[in-house]
Amino acid sequence: MAAMPKPSDSKTGGKATVLLGSQWGDEGKGKLADVLSGQMDVCARCAGGNNAGHTIVADVNGVKTKFDFHLLPSGLVNPRCAGFIGSGVVVHVPSFFAELDTIQKKGLNCDGRLFISDRAHLVFDFHQVVDGLKEVELGGSSIGTTKKGIGPAYSSKASRSGLRVHHLYDPELFATKFRKLVEGRFKRYGHFEYDTEGEIARYRAFAERLRPHIVDGVTFIHTALAQNRKVLVEGANALFLDIDFGTYPFVTSSSTSIGGVLTGLGIPPTAIGDVIGVMKAYTTRVGMGPFPTELHEEIGHHLQEVGAEYGVTTGRRRRCGWLDLVMMRYSCLINGYTSLNLTKLDVLDQLKEIKICVGYVVDGKELPSFPADLEVLAKVEVQYKTLPGWQQDISKTTTWEELPENCRNYVDFIEQFLGVKIEWIGVGPARESMIHRAG
C-alpha cells in the first residue's frame, strides 16, 4: 500500500473537474465525460451504483463502438485514463464483472486501470429482491426505482449493518455479517427464496478476482491530486434525485449533489475546480412525481420520439416537458456550477414556438423558490416565456456563429436568466456534435 500523501495544497495541488446532472437525470453527462476524459488521467464515480446509465460511442481500433456504462466510469473509453469507483458508490460485484467483460469484449482493455475503494459498500442480490418487494408494498405510491437494490444497500449502510469491499478479505467475518444481514431482511419481508450459503461461496470466489482492483480509496484520490493528475468526477443521476435536495421521496438514496462528491471521494472543497452542470434543452424525468412543465400531447410525444427518450438502465419511456428554469436556478444555487453544458438542442429544431418556464404561481402568488412540498409543486401554475423556434437542422453546426439567430437567442435567454455561462452545446448524438464556446 502506498504511503498516505500529504494533504493537497489548494494553491499547488491538483483540482478535480466535476460533472453533475442538473435536472432529473438522463441529461447526457456521458457525452461530455467522453469529450473531457481525453484530457484526464483519472475518471471517478462518487455516488450511486449500477442504477446510472451513460451511453458513449467511441472509436476502438478504427471502429465506432457503442458502450453503455452503468457502474464503471465512462472515462475508461480513453485508454490512458484510469477509472475509480469511490467510497460513496455501492457496488454490485456481479454487475461490475459483467460490465467489465462486456466492454473488454468490445476491444476496450481495462487491465491495470480500474480501481475500487476498499470502503465502498456492497449491493447483494437480496437487496434487489427487497427493492422489488418494497415497491410492491408501496403499491400506488411506488417511487419507481430501477430495482437494482441501490436503496436497500444504502439502507444497510445507514443502519450500520452493511458490508464493505474490505470485508470480503475476512471470510469468516463476511459470512457471519452476511447471514445476519439476510436474516434481518427475512424478518422484515418474510422468508423469500434466497440461497444464503451459495451467495457466500460465490463472493468468496469473487474476492480473488476483485483483489487487483481494490485500493485504499482515500490514498488513491489524494495521491492523484497531489501529483497534479487531471481528475474528472462523473456524477451519477442528478440534483433533483438527491436524497436531501431532490423531489423527495421520488429520489435516489445517495447524495447526487456537489456534497456527494466530497463525501463520496473523501476530498475537501479546496480540491474542487470547475463544476459543470449538464442540462437538457427541455426537461425529462422517469418514474413518478410532480412535473410542472410536462407535455402530454403532440409536442411531448415529439420530444420523446425525436429525442429517443428511453432509459439506458431500465428502457422506460421518459416523461417530457418544456425547460424549467425555476428548477435550474435552484440547481445552480446548490451545486455552484462554473459553467453549463446544454444538450439535445437539436431536438427542438422542428418546433415553431418554444416555451421556457420562468416562474411558479400558487394561489395568485409567485413562489420565491423551488418548493420542498410536493403537494405545492403538483399544483403550481407555470409562467412561461415563449420564444420563436428556428425550424432548421443544426446538427451539422460546429461553431456558435453558425447557429440560427433564434437558436442563439434561446441559449442567451437561458444563460442570462441563470447567470451561468453555457460553455458546451450539444447539437446531435455523435461525439463530434458538440459546440465549445471558449472564453
Swiss-Prot record:
Keyword field contains Magnesium: yes
UniProt keyword Membrane, yes or no: no
An MF annotation (GO) of this entry: DNA replication origin binding
Residues that coordinate or bind substrate: V312, T313, T314, G315, R316, R317, R318
Cofactor, free-text remark: Binds 1 Mg(2+) ion per subunit.
Binding residues for GTP: 25-31, 53-55, 318, 344-346, 426-428
Catalytic residue positions: D26, H54
InterPro entries: Adenylosuccin_syn_GTP-bd, Adenylosuccin_syn_Lys_AS, Adenylosuccinate_synth_dom1, Adenylosuccinate_synth_dom2, Adenylosuccinate_synth_dom3, Adenylosuccinate_synthetase, P-loop_NTPase
Pfam families in the cross-refs: Adenylsucc_synt (PF00709)
Domain of life of the organism encoding this protein: Eukaryota
Binding residues for IMP: D26, E27, G28, K29, N51, A52, G53, H54, T146, R160, N237, T252, R316
Binding site for Mg(2+): D26, G53
Family stated for the protein in its record: Belongs to the adenylosuccinate synthetase family.
Function: Plays an important role in the de novo pathway and in the salvage pathway of purine nucleotide biosynthesis. Catalyzes the first committed step in the biosynthesis of AMP from IMP.
Xref: PANTHER family: ADENYLOSUCCINATE SYNTHETASE
Subunit structure: Homodimer.
Protein name stated in the entry: Adenylosuccinate synthetase
